[in-house]
Amino acid sequence: KAYPQLELRFDVEDRLVDLVNEGVDLDIRIGDDIAPNLIARKLATNYRILCASPEFIAQHGAPKHLTDLSALPCLVIKERDHPFGVWQLRNKEGPHAIKVTGPLSSNHGEIVHQWCLDGQGIALR
């Protein structure tokens, strides 16, 4: 409202955008893959948690240890710059790379979120 002449177009992409050639003035990225020729500022820290529906927990039980995740159906989000199905987790012993699998995966977080709510598996959100 303070700038009524300003026009805004909000595009969501799962790819690296060529800011100059595509005429982009502002780019918000998730991750650490910032090209050295860009001026960047950290906006927030993205904390993640493991999620499952009450129905899923009732059927499969809750994992007691991070390694239990490998034997449970997990919902994998395909992220641009991360190995598929490898969750980087941390507990009191430190960081762990846990390989997970499951019947459903997507590159769209909201779809995985809905699957999780529907009791289809454990999600990292």
What does each model-found stretch correspond to?
Residues 1-36:
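Central regulatory/effector-binding core of bacterial HTH transcription factors
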Residues 17, 21, 33-125:
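C-terminal regulatory
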